């Protein structure tokens, strides 16, 4: 029975009732097979219930008064810490902010590499003051030597970097933002436009100021917000509501925003055809769009790892090997990379 139920679309789970509507075989089995009907009816009663307790690894909820005045709480079964019983959406409805404090292993790798450079070469490196136009760094990225780099490793990203031939930190930021489901489909066009500026076009001239740094491609959530403000007449408050709708990936909320955005585009001078064309560029960001500050933060750390690997490869690869010392297969891969 489960094999007949399709997956949901991006950001939206498939329901049993919807599956019965759209899958003729499932609909027929439900109507004609008593056992199938009994199993599906039982499944419907459990649908939507929490299957297990999961805790966000980095989520911290803050409150002005004791937490239990806002949300039911319990002890985390694994660690003994107090956790909320509300999920992230209910927590927001209760008026509480949730902050994600993420740890990045690559920061420890950077620190170890910097320590080794100082010990061996007597050079003090401040990773926050590296030149952002280092030729060796961009040449290494263009060759696809990305193993051990933050956010830039992996076969898919490496292939795109070799095609892109990045030449600025902006290219790295853009790749960090685009390399995820949805926006990823724009990467080939981004590469084409970087290589041939004659291909850069804008649906409306007003988009030039917003998108000129990304060759006319919508790349960040910020691009969507500025487009809504500049071309649909949104206020900053309305744009922030659009951002929240995109971040939460709630289909019905996005549908309402789509209708409002299209109406705003048309009211502010776009034809219906161009308004829909612009929406088709915005829509992929509804599920996985990156904020520019987020992409720039990740992009900077990615560049820092690339700079150290390009300029101090022995020290950087030693730091990576130390970090992965508990994984023999990883260590073997690192040794193979070093031998190249």
Language-model regions, residue ranges each:
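Alpha-helical scaffold/interaction cores of sigma-54-like transcription cofactors
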Residues: 1-340
């Amino acid at each position: 029975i489960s094999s007949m139920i399709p997956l949901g679309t991006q950001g939206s789970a498939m329901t049993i009732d919807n599956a019965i509507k759209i899958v003729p075989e499932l609909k027929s089995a439900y109507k004609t097979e008593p056992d199938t009907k009994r199993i599906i009816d039982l499944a419907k009663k459990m649908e939507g219930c929490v299957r297990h307790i999961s805790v966000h690894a980095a989520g911290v909820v803050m409150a002005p008064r004791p937490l239990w005045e806002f949300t039911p709480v319990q002890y985390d079964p694994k660690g003994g810490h107090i956790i909320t019983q509300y999920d992230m959406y209910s927590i927001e409805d209760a008026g509480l902010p949730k902050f994600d404090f993420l740890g990045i292993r690559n920061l420890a790798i950077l620190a170890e590499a910097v320590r080794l450079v100082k010990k061996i070469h007597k050079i003090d490196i401040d990773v926050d003051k590296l030149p952002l136009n280092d030729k060796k760094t961009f040449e290494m990225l263009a060759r696809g030597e990305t193993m051990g780099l933050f956010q830039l490793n992996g076969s898919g990203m490496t292939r795109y970097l070799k095609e892109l031939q990045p030449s600025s930190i902006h290219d790295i930021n853009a790749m960090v933002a685009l390399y995820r489901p949805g926006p990823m489909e724009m990467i080939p066009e981004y590469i084409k436009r970087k290589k041939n500026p004659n291909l850069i076009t804008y649906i409306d001239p007003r988009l030039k100021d917003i998108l000129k740094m990304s060759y006319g491609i919508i790349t960040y959530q910020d691009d969507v917000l500025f487009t809504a403000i500049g071309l649909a007449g949104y206020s900053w408050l309305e744009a922030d509501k659009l951002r929240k709708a995109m971040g939460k990936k709630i289909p019905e909320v996005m549908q309402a925003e789509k209708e409002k955005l299209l109406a705003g585009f048309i009211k502010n001078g776009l034809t219906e055809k161009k308004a829909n064309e612009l929406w088709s560029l915005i829509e992929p960001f509804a599920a996985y769009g990156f904020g520019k500050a987020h992409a720039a933060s990740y992009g900077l750390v990615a560049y820092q790892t690339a700079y150290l690997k390009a300029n101090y490869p022995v020290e950087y690869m030693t730091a990576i090997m130390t970090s992965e010392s508990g994984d023999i297969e990883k260590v073997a891969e690192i040794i193979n990379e070093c031998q190249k």
